[in-house]
Amino acid sequence: MIRTRTNFLRPAVTLLVAACAAITARPTPAERGHSPLIVVSPTEPREQTADQQVQQVLNRLGFGPRPGDVAKVRALGVDQWIALQLAPDRIEDGAAERVVASYETIAKPTAELIAMYDRGQLAIRQRQKARAQSGDTSSKMDLRAEVLQGDPALREQLRQNQRILGDVQSAKLARAVVSERQLDEVMVDFWENHFNVFAGKGLDRIFIPAFDRDVIRPNALGNFRTLLGAVAKSPAMLFYLDQWQSAADSTQPTLAVARGARAGARRAAPTAGMTMEELDRLAPNAQLTPTQRKRLEAMTSEQRMQVVQQRAQAGARAKRGLNENYARELMELHTLGVDGGYTQRDIIEVARALTGWTMNPRGTAEFVFRPEMHDVAQKVVLGHVIAGGGGVEDGEAVLDIVARHPATAHFIAHKLAVRFVSDTPPAALVERAAQTFLKTDGDIRAVVRTIVTSAEFFSRSAYRAKVKSPFELVASAFRAIDAQPDTTMRSAQMVGFLGAPIFGHQAPNGWPETGESWMNSGAILNRINFGVGVAAGRFPGATLSHWSEMEHLKAATREQQVDAVILAFFGGQSSPDTREILLNGENPLAAKLSASVPADSASADLGVMGTGADNAPTRGRVLAPAKNGAPRPAVGRALGQPVQLNGLAQVVGLAIGAPEFQRR
């Protein structure tokens, strides 16, 4: 090797010791309002070596090391680094903030995004209507193609519509690549998969930016009940699982009718009415526009009562009925788990309690409680009685019950242990994490701390025990070469090409957390080809010229280059087979897998897969799910024409496709 490991790291260590001293000299949490810095020292020996522990935390609590990160963790200490990551508000993250600020749409209010989306859709509908009146029966796709070719203003408008989803996908990956708050980004990815919403369902592509920005990110390391409530009231989830349309069964009285009847009974029949104060108490979140409020204020109390009763009757006529979708997924996927001890009767009772939890799909698209849709009768959920006559508080009571249930503690603890430790985490660790959940009333930060400071986390069996998801693979590859964040959609599209489009899982269970789901022949081949694409500079911002070792290794021998790449990309450890592949420049597995890929699937269009470009024609295909239900990636060349790499670029490309890099 050109440099020994000590020489390789010494300059960075010298600088970072001073930086770490500055970190420890920061004002106290009380002075700055930051989260406490809790350093947990090991209470028993750790099986992993010191070097392995550094790699473990960088690859599990983050998306892999950037150049210099290994030295930083060594200088700071593994336990101190963990403590700092668990207090992300103490970490300066200006680079990530600047990247996020460069996107056009992710900071825009949902109402503005809806208006933006509607303008383009309205123009298309108007042209369709004009065509229909003239007898033209061309399809919407033909019309869209004509508009895009002939109307620059509308073309730009439709591009903005596509960008709404593309921006939030790209920004999520860019943050994972550049952010210093790595654990926070890992937890955002975890919860957005746990509380999965599908961008391909209608207006959800417009609701997802706020879901990411206002619901998940502020609560990723916070309180589980708070996070659960924010998700339950988010337009993205309300729309995705049809909760916004769920209303009391026609056989059940609604809250508006019941309260209206009680208000009327207090007056003589000819003078029964409703004051504005009573209306506000009846529906405190009604989101009345100024015009609507003025109109109601101008009415007599009797007229106002009549409007409320008419609205309640209209709600009953809407025939929306009780929808169990969200209630079922709330219990099965979000809290208790499939074995959580609930019954179909519990699902129905939860759905009844949540009737009236809806939103205005247009305008502000904010959560609103509609009393005319709410089932007013008594409910019994998991043995807990929710008295009749309640309103929005019925749903809050349900969230309280399930968030604090022991089955939820175990389910969340197990899922976090799978994410951080192994696909089959030790039962004792899961139990300790579940107890932390219960003792802290769902403190996510405390549960994660229990897991990532445990002996099981630092066991030999946990080291490189996890297979990277497509998102983790792309982010870690870009971090390894010190790539600049890609603010186009191309890199985010690559995540979809590898099998897991960002916000692209249609079913509510989210992408799999276990490695077997990502390791079939097509997936492995695509991962190998992705490594070649990265080394060839096929992604904006991701070129080897950014890698700090590139310049001085150009003139090194092949063996020296291989040793340096193994140190930088694998933490210094590789199998003899991998080392031989890096030395000779040939991957026999790639050739074998290429021969097994069907010829008719040898082309795929990266430009439209798993992105906001849902209206573009799709070339190639995505394989049907495997027999076990696991996703299969698209197969083919999504990286342009094949390229033959040489020298150091070849070593790097092969390293990214190697098993050691595919695991974390």
Residue ranges: model-predicted function:
Residues R10-A22:
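Bacterial N-terminal signal peptides
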Residues C20-S35:
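Signal peptide processing junction and immediate N-terminal pro/mature segment
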Residues V186-M187, R225-T226, A446-V447, G647-V651:
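Alpha-helical scaffolds flanking conserved acidic
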Residues V186, F211-D212, A236-M237, A568, ...:
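Surface-exposed interaction patches
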Residues V147-L158, Q162, V168-K172, D204-N219, ...:
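Active-site substrate-binding loop specific to GH73 endo-beta-N-acetylglucosaminidase modules
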Residues M1-F8:
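N-terminal secretory signal peptides that target proteins for export/translocation
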Residues P67-F190, H194, A199-A210, V215-N219, ...:
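N-terminal accessory alpha/beta regions
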